[in-house]
């Protein structure tokens, strides 16, 4: 992805829960952008993303963790509503949205189950781990499916993506609030290194100038973190002795 912005935001999870949520968010965003399947290449990219998403969903208690977080965020909003001069209408609107997200998520079938049981998805998943294992002679079912009218394939893809809607809406609401929970503060790294504490934070967000083409290498956990800034060009690039950047511990 490229654009003309002068800054770039990097994010780093400080616990396994946030790591899984960011991976799920990334997969859901990819599925949305890949949903127009008009070739074997675009279809395999879509099915590969579904496979990666299902693997993440199978590893932990994603639904229960999200429901706990929705409840925690509602409790925080309830406290905010008691702050003098707060816009009570905005706070109540967010609380209502979180409540609706929690109800929809709790009532939804097992996350990803309908995708796992789908015949086309199941057949492709079995072949994706085999190098070039999705040729027409390997998957005649997929070969035939790709020759269905585009409208029929679009309808099936829409059904698959819509089955993930309770998950996507709950996760989007949670991550929006977490990202907005802390403001960016100015920091300066010395000789390409910075360390600090992040008590109670789930997510680090760094905003860097696009030039001089540096990226952060972050190590950390729920209480402390360290950032090493490295040049994109490891041979010719360099890191300023004092690098200004912005940091938010969310």
From Swiss-Prot:
It holds the Pfam family ZapD. It comes from the Bacteria. It is found in: Cytoplasm. The keyword Cell division applies. GO terms for cellular component: cell division site; cytoplasm. InterPro entries: ZapD, ZapD_C, ZapD_sf. Interacts with FtsZ. Cell division factor that enhances FtsZ-ring assembly. Directly interacts with FtsZ and promotes bundling of FtsZ protofilaments, with a reduction in FtsZ GTPase activity. Belongs to the ZapD family. This is Cell division protein ZapD.
């Amino acid at each position: 992805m490229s654009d003309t912005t002068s800054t770039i935001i990097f994010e780093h999870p400080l616990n396994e829960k946030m790591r899984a949520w960011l991976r799920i968010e990334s997969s859901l965003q990819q599925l949305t952008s890949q949903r127009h399947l008009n070739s074997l290449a675009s279809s395999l990219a879509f099915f590969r993303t579904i496979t990666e998403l299902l693997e993440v969903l199978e590893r932990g208690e994603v639904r229960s963790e999200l429901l706990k977080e929705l409840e925690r965020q509602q409790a925080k909003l309830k406290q905010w509503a008691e702050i003098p001069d707060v816009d009570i209408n905005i706070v109540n609107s967010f609380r209502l949205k979180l409540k609706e997200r929690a109800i929809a998520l709790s009532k939804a079938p097992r996350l990803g189950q309908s995708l796992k049981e789908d015949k086309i998805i199941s057949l492709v998943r079995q072949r994706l781990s085999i190098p070039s294992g999705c040729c027409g002679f390997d998957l005649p079912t997929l070969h035939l499916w790709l020759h269905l009218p585009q409208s029929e394939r679009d309808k099936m893809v829409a059904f698959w993506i819509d089955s993930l809607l309770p998950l996507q809406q709950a996760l989007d609401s949670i991550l929006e609030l977490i990202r907005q929970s802390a403001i960016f503060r100015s920091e300066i790294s010395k000789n390409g290194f910075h360390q600090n504490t992040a008590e109670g934070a789930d997510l680090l967000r760094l905003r860097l100038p696009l030039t001089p083409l540096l990226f952060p290498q972050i190590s950390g956990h729920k209480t402390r973190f360290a950032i090493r800034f490295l040049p994109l060009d490891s041979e010719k690039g360099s890191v300023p002795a004092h690098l200004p950047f912005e940091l938010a511990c969310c």
